[in-house]
Amino acid sequence: MTTRYVVGIDLGTTNSALAYADTGAGTDPKAKTFRIPQIVNPGAVEERDLLPSFLYLPGANEQPAGALKLPWDADRDFAVGEFARNFGGKVPTRLVSSAKSWLCHPGVDRKAAILPFRAGEEDRRVSPLDACTRYLKHIVEAWNANIAKAVPEHRLEVQEVILTVPASFDAAARDLTIEAARAAGLENLTLLEEPQAAFYAWLDNLGDDWRNSVAVGDLVLVADVGGGTTDFTLIEVNEEAGNLALTRLAVGDHLLLGGDNMDLAVAHTAAAGLAKAGTKLDGGQMLQMTYAARQAKEQLLADAKLTKAPITILGKGRSVVSGTIKYELPRSDVEAVLVDGFFPECERTAEPARARASGLQELGLPYVADAGITRHLAHFLNRQAEALAGRDKPGGAKKKKAAAEAIALPTAVLFNGGVFKADPLRNRFLNVLNAWAKSAKAEPIRSLAGADLDLAVARGAAYYGLVRRGKGVRIRGGTARAYYIGVESSAPAVPGFPAPLKALCVAPFGMEEGTETDVPGQEFGLIVGEEAEFRFLGSTIRRDDKPGTLVDDWDGQIDELSPMIVTLDGKPDQGRFVPVQLHSKVTEVGQLEVWCRSKDGKRRWKLEFNVREQK
């Protein structure tokens, strides 16, 4: 069924947004932003372009009756959005933030009530999955209370929805995102990678003129630095039947590095300033400082005329006024810590620092050890150089781009994410890239003028929905990784040494949505009624492996992901040994499925991702 509305939802780590195109409003529908009603002060609801991805779980009697009331829910006992972010920052043990980052953390049970992470025994907790569901549910309810108020057929649950995810999200994290969306009532769903959505927004913004901004052979880097993650994507411009075409060639590894890290760095900078003045913060005050620093940072980055921004946190005194701690955060301090700390000048051959493993580590989000985004960029481009070297290159520009291709340098960059609203950060990023281009004797790398950095992903997702209906150019790409099942070697056991693990390819890099394949060559023996676990792996750089390819030596090229589990049901056959082979499918939604099929072809069982805590 073709729906009237095509809807794009950006479920962001820091902010979420919705854009839509009304296909019933004319012959040339355009994506536009839906302003989301939300609580901004106790008892006050207003519309905003963005829904801050924060969940406030108040304690008993912390808010007056009706303070959290919404037009569609008079009895709401929690809040998401602007008020949740602003007030919750003052009581951080009752504020859920970065739920999307926790959703992709394989070291915790993502369906267990673990957030807020530092909540006390008396505080309420929710799971990362539940928090993301609540953000999406709020968006669904807000849409239905406005767009679909008088027309039930316009309810969001029955519209075509494009939901974005980081390009670096693995298959398990994508599955959990789909689960959250379906729990919020969204069934007519397709996933889209956020950097691709940003590129679609650029295409939509330029219309047919985009063909005058790029040429055959161009390699566009989409640099997407959001609240929780840094995503790098390479998109190539090629030619097909005389027309320009686009192909997503590569995505980077999952980097838990973004605005959250920057907020913490700014908070420590402010705390150091207070310490010099004789005020030392305790652990609880540092949590408050982190949220207050985020607001101050966003004020400074949003208004280039501001020279400083105020920070206020609660002290330890009984009096609210007398116990207040205030600090003026200078713009110069913010720009110094962000520019030099997160976008340092470095050589093209630079590698990010790796963390030393310690005997005891505090549980928390697995942030990267090195905050230097430019060093991670160098690693990404150099790692992709060899992977891209053997591909079929577009004709006509091979010689011109040879030097850049030899080191996987892009010819253009498209910025995305609120971080890049700050001119100094964009300029430093581009200057570092151009220093590398100069050293490689390549042409200068240009910046493509993007759309609104906060809303581009949602708008691009809505535009992609129109593309799916034949109204624009589509970026080809398929799966962003090749996927593998781990197979232990059959060699004799050696005391003290684990059996070598081989990687069996079950889904090739770039496997398209709506396709499926048998995995030849390998047979597994499973027992009916017993749970079997498969080690699951992925690679962003191995492009030539086909289903059934068995890789012996894959160190540094393939990474271990969340395992997959399957239980063969069938009570009459309990305990019976069943030989099975694997079959893979990428659904139209963009979800990878791996199935076990009995050799006689009569039965099959789906493997599920084990998203519980990994020991």
Kindly give the residue locations of the regions a language model identified.
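Acidic low-complexity intrinsically disordered segments
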Residues: 187, 315-387, 472-615
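Short glycine-rich phosphate-binding loop at a beta-alpha junction
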Residues: 150-166, 281-288, 310, 389-418, ...
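Phosphate-binding loop and its immediate beta->loop->alpha context
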Residues: 31-182, 193, 264-310, 316-354
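Phosphate/ATP-binding catalytic cores across multiple sugar-kinase/actin-like superfamilies
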Residues: 134-153, 201-213, 341-409, 428-429, ...
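Conserved phosphate-binding catalytic cores of ATP/NTP-utilizing and phosphoryl-transfer enzymes
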Residues: 1-4, 191-223, 392-403, 455-474
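Conserved phosphate-binding/catalytic loops in two-lobed NTP-binding clefts
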Residues: 184-197, 366, 429-460
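Glycine-rich phosphate-binding loops at beta-strand->alpha-helix junctions
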Residues: 161-176, 288, 292, 314-319, ...
